Swiss-Prot record:
Signal peptide span: 1-30
Protein name, entry field: Endoglucanase G
Reaction(s) catalysed by this chain's protein: Endohydrolysis of (1->4)-beta-D-glucosidic linkages in cellulose, lichenin and cereal beta-D-glucans
Lineage: Bacteria, Bacillati, Bacillota, Clostridia, Eubacteriales
A Gene Ontology molecular function term of the record: cellulase activity
Domain Dockerin residues, every copy: 497-564
Database matches in InterPro entries: Dockerin_1_rpt, Dockerin_dom, Dockerin_dom_sf, EF_Hand_1_Ca_BS, Glyco_hydro_5, Glyco_hydro_5_CS, Glycoside_hydrolase_SF
Keyword Nucleotide-binding listed: no
CDD domains hit by this protein: Dockerin_I
Active site per UniProt: 226, 381
Tagged with keyword Signal: yes
GO biological process, one term: cellulose catabolic process
Amino acid sequence: MKKAKAIFSLVVALMVLAIFCFAQNTGSTATTAAAAVDSNNDDWLHCKGNKIYDMYGNEVWLTGANWFGFNCSENCFHGAWYDVKTILTSIADRGINLLRIPISTELLYSWMIGKPNPVSSVTASNNPPYHVVNPDFYDPETDDVKNSMEIFDIIMGYCKELGIKVMIDIHSPDANNSGHNYELWYGKETSTCGVVTTKMWIDTLVWLADKYKNDDTIIAFDLKNEPHGKRGYTAEVPKLLAKWDNSTDENNWKYAAETCAKAILEVNPKVLIVIEGVEQYPKTEKGYTYDTPDIWGATGDASPWYSAWWGGNLRGVKDYPIDLGPLNSQIVYSPHDYGPSVYAQPWFEKDFTMQTLLDDYWYDTWAYIHDQGIAPILIGEWGGHMDGGKNQKWMTLLRDYIVQNRIHHTFWCINPNSGDTGGLLGNDWSTWDEAKYALLKPALWQTKDGKFIGLDHKIPLGSKGISLGEYYGTPQASDPPATPTATPTKPAASSTPSFIYGDINSDGNVNSTDLGILKRIIVKNPPASANMDAADVNADGKVNSTDYTVLKRYLLRSIDKLPHTT
């Protein structure tokens, strides 16, 4: 029993520490702080085949959306003139369990050197009862808004509290609202840090990974948004061309991604590394390489090139797969895919179906990676206008393919101010486009009765969702981590059993997750690792509905200790 008390004391200490770290300076309550308690290191993910698993071997489905702004000149979410936490709460309640956050290398560099660039177009006021908007962004010492890094850290705390996980996307080298148009991850002049180099790009990502290595809110890094560029017709290979081959050239995206990924995984081997494709890939089966100029007017079989959306071409994986050695378990490939309202690609010219899209574009460009079990696919951007025509038809077909194959994805986008696609939110940043959301909703991870499933083992996804722990009942060890990470420490077996009454999943806490497991025990569907001794919370030698009532009363604080024997 001493051992159980020691475990319980450690858990209490960790809870207090978590509350201290994530409680906000203003507007915080004990309830809010308690909701943010998390062990910080139990939600890391890894891959096996084309699936993604939690550290206990339970399969997960990453179903999210994009919210841009940190990549832009404002250095903060667009829409921060409204209350960001309110928007995030709505996002969580709508079932988005992963938020892809575009950001610039320029902004990360300012954080890394300790001189965070300022934000603009952010409202921050804490003057109750008259005006309270983003009160945690307000700095009373300066009577002004906090800097970009402080605001980002606060937002990560909000995401943790709401059960939202985050994927960082290096959207552009410079802080630029049109920065995605630049082809590469290096070579761009910025207004605050000179020219972004490959080293700067890697160093800033490693710095951020190290900063958050003990906080599993950020679970993935999308190394570079949409590397692209066309080969052209000249003999000389263009400098602004992202290619995918076996060279060590600086513009070889495959080589750069491997180099960057290995550096990140040195500081945190548990994060997912998300790698996009390029725009063009040579027809290597015909002997063509990146040294082969394009042919004027050549199309179809006559062209030396396979074309795709920016960042969408992953044909190179079949010839030159990413190799991270023992940490290949962290690789996720990530195409982007759009409809005809963004650009009238040739595969949209016919009366297309899911099968024609697969035959003409999807399968050989990226879907084969999932189909052949090479690695998971996460479609980092997809979305568009609800036009009632071809674009909406494409969006529905891709949605159906995502659902049928449980493809991971992040929808583009939350923002209403994306010109190519529009957003899930209206211009007031509070009204949802219900028709577009209805199209997306079936592709969000949820139970059969419509409860959204988060990626945090303890914190439910918003007010209408459940946690991963509640969904699976208790961690399962059927597929142990493939990454070199420490396994969870649990009480060792001894001749005298040590346990905490009510701690049915043996994680050191007594909470609603245990109540859910107890319910499964009562209906004869117990998890294999459930601690039946801990479930007998009235110590009568049986586990039945009486124990459920007792544990529920304990969690509601109607009784103050377990076992409850009266």
